[in-house]
Amino acid sequence: MAILTLTIDGQPVSGTEVETLLDVAREHGIDIPTLCHLDGLKDVGACRLCLVEVEGSSKLLPACTTRLQEGMVVHTNTEKLQRYRRTIVEMLASEGNHHCAVCVSNNHCELQDLAYRVGLQYVRVPYLYPSKTLDATHRDFVIDRDRCILCTRCVRVCDEVEGAHTWDIAGRGIGCEIVADLKQAWGTSPSCTSCGKCVLVCPTGALFEKGATVAEMEKRTDFLRYIVTARKRREWNPDLLDEE
C-alpha cells in the first residue's frame, strides 16, 4: 500500500490512502475536536466539529471522513474554523436543555469540555427549549432526549458492535430524535439486550444509569476499542489494547 505525504498545520506527515485526515492528525499529535467520532465505530461526519481547510478545496471538509491524497495541505485551527466550531457548540447548546449544574454528566461531558475549549461563555442564538420525551421505562437506564445532540454514537454501537440495532433516528429538523425500535418505550423493546454500550459511549447526559445523581455518570469508551480489536484478531486477550 502506497505511503502518501501531506502537510497538516505546517507539519509534514504521512499515511496510507485508507486513512482519514483525523487518523493521521492524531497519530502525529495534532488535536482536532470531535463529538460524533469514536474509535471502533464507522464515521458519519455528523457533528461537523472536525471540519478542516484543505488548500485547493472551495469548501470545508470533515477530517473524520476525508481520505488522504498526495500533497494535501491542511489547516486545522484557523480563525475561520474556530468561529465555525464555536457556532456549532452554541447551536448544540441552544437546541437542547443542557443544565450542567444539575446534570448527571457534569464534569464528565464532552459537549461541556468543548464549550470550555472554544471559550463559550454565553450563547448568542435563541434557546429553543425543547420538551422531548424522557424515557425511564428501562430497568437499568434512562434516556433524556432533551440532552441528546444526535451524534448517533448509540445508534452505531448498538448496530455495529452489539448487533441489536435497537436505536435509530426518527423525525426531521428540530423534531429529530433517537427512538427505540418502532418508536416504542425503551423498557418494552424486544431487541434491546441491556448491554449498556449505548450509555457508555454517549458524550452527554442523554443516556445514563438509573440511580446516578449530579456529576456521577462518568463515561468510558475504552471497552469499545478492546472489543473491536479482539474481534479483529479473533482472540480474547486482556493485553490486546496494550499492544495497539
Q: Which stretches of residues belong to each language-model region?
A:
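Extended, non-catalytic structural segments that build the interaction scaffolds
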Residues: 9-11, 143-144
